[in-house]
Amino acid sequence: MKTKPVFVYKGDALAKYNFGDNHPFGPKRHHVFHDELERLSLGALVQITPPSRASIDQLALFHTSSYIDQVSRASEDGKGFLDDGDTPAFLGVFEAASDVVGTTLAAIDAIMHGQARRAFSPIGGLHHARRDKAGGFCVFNDCGVAIHYLRENYNVQRILYVDIDAHHGDGIFYDFEDDADLLFADIHQDGDTLYPGTGASDETGIGNAVNTKINLSLPPGATDNEFSEAWAKVENYLMDNPPEFIILQCGADSLAGDPITQLNLTEAAHRMAALSLCQIADRHCDGRIIGLGGGGYNLDNIAKAWTQVIKAFLVNQKS
């Protein structure tokens, strides 16, 4: 029997990455997505795959040893915060965050070994964590680890990172700001109106990496029309910048009704972006793309947005 070309990751280890019932990043996000996947009869079309755990050496591809140690210690007593007040410590946070990273790396392995054409992890895309600190509900930055992992393990150098979460992907942008081989495209709510307050249009990279990054901010209340205009700029940018691998951070907090953001997109924006990137992946890098769930704090929106990404990943699939 042929291996199904789209891997989707599922397991209690992923669901354990949450900050409790009273926190926006709560415990139901993982299950809501998988319930919707089954309701739409998509579960039978993908290969449901268990999570994996990252090693300390893998975490250290991006994070400092002192920060890894800090999270490990906080995980033992589960008290306090890992940042200035957004990201609480909890018992087992080190293991839970390591499972997020390990699952993203497993998705890369599945694609690079030819087991999968696309892959999606709902609890991933923790784009605010920096090399030496947590931020914005993000403990370890699986995207940052993934970029180094691709380079060190598969000699994949020219990587495209696309972020359509309502929040700017500061943990990737600033830690790869001078990296000319990290192509970066981010559509987000205007940083003057939303955490982390970054991602201005004139931030295009520094040094040899100038013009390898594109930041496109949307005003509060922006709809699919404004997103489509921004996405056309992303596609134009990518015409001259073919990648070897694509990472899509597809946060669902850009949809109308999210409790902590103010954009008014629909899930059609996620489908459009995912379809476009799949076409680019098929054209330039043998279809290699992973999707990471990112943010999203309205459970209905999570279910709608992420399943649209899966539908896009299933279009014109090849074995």
What spans do the regions from the language model cover?
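Generic alpha-helix structural propensity
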Residues: 28, 32, 54, 62-66, ...
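N-terminal low-complexity, Ser/Thr- and acidic-residue-enriched intrinsically disordered segments
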Residues: 1-60
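Charged, often glycine-rich, active-site loop that binds/positions anionic groups
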Residues: 52-76
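Short amphipathic alpha-helical segments with coiled-coil-like heptad repeat character
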Residues: 41-43, 67, 113
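A general "terminal functional-core" signal
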Residues: 2-9, 15, 69-319
